[in-house]
UniProtKB/Swiss-Prot annotation:
GO biological process, one term: L-leucine biosynthetic process
Pyruvate carboxyltransferase domain span: 47-325
Catalytic activity: 3-methyl-2-oxobutanoate + acetyl-CoA + H2O = (2S)-2-isopropylmalate + CoA + H(+)
Gene behind the chain: gloH
This protein's name: Isopropyl malate synthase gloH
Protein keywords: Amino-acid biosynthesis, Branched-chain amino acid biosynthesis, Leucine biosynthesis, Transferase
Biotechnology: Pneumocandin B0 is the starting molecule for the first semisynthetic echinocandin antifungal drug, caspofungin acetate. Pneumocandin B0 is a minor fermentation product, and its industrial production was achieved by a combination of extensive mutation and medium optimization. Inactivation of three of gloP/GLP450-1, gloO/GLP450-2, and gloM/GLOXY1 generates 13 different pneumocandin analogs that lack one, two, three, or four hydroxyl groups on 4R,5R-dihydroxy-ornithine and 3S,4S-dihydroxy-homotyrosine of the parent hexapeptide.
One Pfam assignment: IPMS_D2
Length: 617
């Protein structure tokens, strides 16, 4: 057995017998930028966003979108707020060309503030086709691209550097002649962009020469700058190296005010978002990407992650992801690609905490913020900074969001707080108590929460899966005998329609004294020894103070045996609620709180009556 030093001193042998260093080492171009400025900067404004879902995203699909699917995706992008959308590669297929024409020729299809962009190779025939596809557009971006690195130029294009620059100059001048300089096309407001394919592996001075050539050939202005796209076509370095490359280009290109630097990153090393963020610090003006990080190989930059990163720093992005679940649904239907449950912001598990310590921290953080009082059971919607629920319209606290383990308010993305807590065998009493509070309006005491959490953990282990919020609430009603006709009707009365917001912040009151008196009466009546060891209750009321009901929680010793049993009672009066909880506890034998858990793992949980909030009692 070799020791650690010996193992790390051995050269790794890659496929083909090459050493690791000779095969992969020192591939990134060397750039000297000792006076770099980007590390000391801070993002304070959003870049221009370009969606390339209909181009880069579409070409990466096993089954490219049909015209109908493209149309649906375009409408989705417009509804989100994208004002620059790359819609096609017109010379690639008739479908691409026809879709572009459909967007232009269909009245009202393209809003006045949306600019269509098409992508074209740096060839005159392809450029001509692309321009024809845009004929009649109110405003359009013609975007060419050309390989920039020596490797691509020599291997793929097989051109010298002089020939390469001449091709770029010739194609840009041709594009200009048939767009903004052509009287027949002058009604369209033309913008022009040029993509530096494999910029991340290009020599900095060569990229600059190409940029100057393009700028001179197009003739941009401050009001209509030329777009120069700097791409990590295949991510090859750490994000800081790419930031240095972008800053070098931004600082050295002449007439910088006439240039819009567009950042196009890929996720081959998992750093697409980080690379784009640092590139914006280094001078990037526009960011290109796809929803949910779709794109070739490991994907393009995820526009949702990048924009929400800025959103959570208080930066207005101009993009609306307040109904992210609906956006995800449309995306998955159109692309036939699933969104990973751990995807930042949009995955099913992004907000969800399973660990007990995390759940407890979230519960306490929300309570401190004062959100529990304003949170109804079920879906919470956001509208202009207000919580809307029935007739209640309460302002959210204006303090900075600081809830442990929740990077942002789930409601800002259209998620309900039911999505925050996930229960499995690792969960603690705090999260379970919170779900009961949200689902049933019961502020259960810590001792009961600890008792019930053990039951839930056993059930989770037995079923070999986590439990949904509705299951946990349903099981609570079953365990504590709250499914009787009387209780069900009362709970339905409390929850039906939610015409009023239930106050989730009701404080527990000690009810031990009245419970002990009632316990003595029950002992005489039933002929068993019932001793109340703990009792509490609280009012279930609306935010405007109307009392709706009472709930009581009692812990009892039956016939002086252990463990103690719990009873929960719901009634219109406190006294009746205490009595009912004692009666339910007295009927129970110690250790019988755990019913048969032989339930199919694949069983579909049916919503409980009390959760049908729209159903009138």
């Amino acid at each position: 057995m070799k020791n650690t030093d010996e193992r790390y001193s051995m050269a790794t042998c890659c496929a083909g017998g090459q050493s690791l260093r000779s095969k992969y080492g020192e591939r990134a171009p060397n750039i000297q930028l000792s006076d770099r400025q980007w590390p000391s900067k801070k993002l304070t404004k959003s870049p221009i966003w370009l969606s390339t879902d209909l181009r880069d995203g579409n070409q990466a699909l096993p089954n490219p979108m049909t015209l109908q699917q493209k149309w649906r995706m375009f409408q989705l992008l417009v509804s989100i707020g994208f004002t620059q959308i790359e819609v096609s590669f017109p010379c690639a297929s008739q479908t691409e060309f026809d879709f572009t024409r459909q967007l232009i020729e269909t009245p009202g299809a393209t809003p006045d503030d949306v600019t269509l962009e098409v992508l074209s190779p740096c060839r005159e025939d392809a450029i001509a086709t692309s321009v024809r596809s845009l004929k009649g557009a109110k405003q359009a971006i013609l975007f060419l691209y050309l390989a920039t690195s020596d490797n691509y130029r020599e291997t793929v294009l097989q051109l010298s550097e002089a020939e390469w620059l001449d091709q770029a100059k010739r194609c840009v001048e041709y594009a200009r002649s048939i767009t903004k300089d052509d009287p027949e096309n002058c009604r369209t407001k033309w913008s022009f962009g040029f993509g530096f394919e494999d910029f991340a592996n290009a020599r900095p001075e060569a990229a600059l020469r190409l940029g100057e050539t393009i700028k001179t050939a197009w003739g941009p202005s401050k009001d209509n700058p030329v777009i120069l796209g700097l791409a990590t076509s295949v991510e090859a370095t750490t994000p800081n190296v790419f930031a240095d490359q972008v800053e070098y280009f931004s600082r050295n290109i002449t007439e910088r005010e006439k240039v819009c630097i567009s950042i196009h990153t890929h996720n081959d090393r998992g750093g697409a978002v980080a690379s784009a963020e640092l590139a914006c610090l280094a001078g990037g003006d526009r960011v290109e990407g796809c929803l949910f990080g779709n794109g070739e190989r490991a994907g393009n930059l995820d526009l949702i992650t990048c924009s929400m990163n800025m959103f959570t720093q208080g930066i207005e992005t101009g993009l609306d992801f307040s109904d992210l679940l609906e956006i995800r649904r449309v995306y998955e239907e159109v692309t036939n690609l699933p969104v990973h449950p751990r995807q930042p912001y949009s995955g099913d598990f992004y907000f969800r905490a399973f660990a007990g310590a995390h759940q407890d921290a979230i519960r306490k953080g929300l309570a401190k913020r004062g959100r529990l009082a304003a949170m109804p059971s079920g879906l919470t919607q956001m509208s202009k900074g207000m919580i809307i629920n029935g007739t209640s319209n309460e302002k959210i606290p204006s303090s900075t969001w600081r809830v442990p383990y929740l990077p942002l308010d789930p409601a800002d993305l259209g998620f309900s707080f039911d999505s925050v807590i996930g229960v499995n065998s690792q969960s603690g009493k705090g999260g379970i108590a919170w779900l009961i509070q949200q689902g049933l309006g019961f502020n259960i005491p810590n001792e009961l929460a600890a008792h019930y959490s053990q039951i839930i953990k056993k059930r989770s282990v037995s079923l070999e899966r986590g439990l949904a919020a509705e299951e946990i609430c349903d099981f609570f009603l079953e365990i504590y005998d709250l499914k009787s006709s009387y209780n069900t009707q009362l709970l339905k009365r409390l929850h039906s329609g939610f015409s009023q917001t239930i106050d989730m912040q009701q404080e527990l009151e000690d009810a031990t004294a009245p419970a002990n008196n009632a316990a003595m009466d029950i002992s005489k009546t039933m002929g068993i020894d019932v001793h109340c060891t703990m009792a509490s209750s609280h009012v279930i009321s609306s935010h405007d103070g109307e009392q709706l009901s009472n709930v009581a929680f009692v812990q009892c010793e039956i016939e002086q045996t252990t463990p103690c049993v719990w009873g929960v009672g719901v009634a219109l009066s406190r006294e009746e609620a205490v009595n009912r909880s004692l009666l339910l506890a007295a009927r129970r034998k110690p250790g019988t709180e755990t019913p048969d858990t032989k339930t199919s793992v694949n069983a579909i949980i049916q919503p409980l009556e009390v959760y049908s909030f729209s159903q009138k009692a």
